[in-house]
Design a protein with these regions (language model features):
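N-terminal regions of proteins, emphasizing targeting and processing segments when present
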Residues: 9, 18-20
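Positively charged, low-complexity terminal tracts
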Residues: 14, 21-161
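Bacterial N-terminal signal peptides that target proteins for export
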Residues: 1-11
Length: 161
């Protein structure tokens, strides 16, 4: 069951990513899954803006947080499949010996473009770089891979509605 939380920081970041007109919008964040490390959290979520018509009113979001430092990466439904494809490729490319970059995605429709780099090694690393916030990387370990993949699929389904 999704966790619904009022994450003002994530809503603001997503609103900026979507359009300046959304800055004042009252949207809803639905956190599909949370992944935690001692000093870092990664949320897989959706953001829905009720002021826009469906299906263009939703984006998928990866929200990174380390204490008070936060950043997010968002993709519209038509772009979310690229993330799931990169994820699948990264899970196949894992190696105990070295890290390899699998691919990079960029946000669209914003002046402050965040980039997400997916790498494979001993797990899958998701790294965000952005002019609007701190660069962060989250390592999804083997024990969490199935749950992360399921969260990506759930967001894909939500965005398709």
């Amino acid at each position: 069951m999704p966790i619904r939380v009022p994450l003002a920081w994530l809503a603001a970041a997503v609103a900026v990513a979507l359009s300046p007109a959304l800055l004042l919008a009252k949207g809803q964040i639905e956190v599909v899954a949370k992944f935690q490390r001692p000093n870092l959290e990664l949320d897989v979520a959706t953001y829905t803006d009720p002021e826009f018509e469906s299906p263009g009113n939703k984006v998928g979001v990866l929200g990174f947080a380390s204490g008070p430092v936060r950043n997010s990466f968002s993709l519209r439904g038509e772009d979310w499949a690229q993330l799931t494809d990169l994820w699948a490729k990264a899970t196949r490319m894992q190696s105990r010996k070295q890290w390899r970059t699998v691919g990079t995605l960029s946000e669209r429709g914003t002046a402050e473009v965040s980039r997400l780099t997916v790498s494979a090694g001993q797990g899958v690393r998701l790294a965000i770089t952005s002019p609007k916030g701190a660069s962060m990387a989250f390592l999804v370990g083997s024990a969490e891979m199935a749950r992360f993949e399921a969260a990506l699929a759930q967001v894909k389904d939500i965005l398709a509605k």
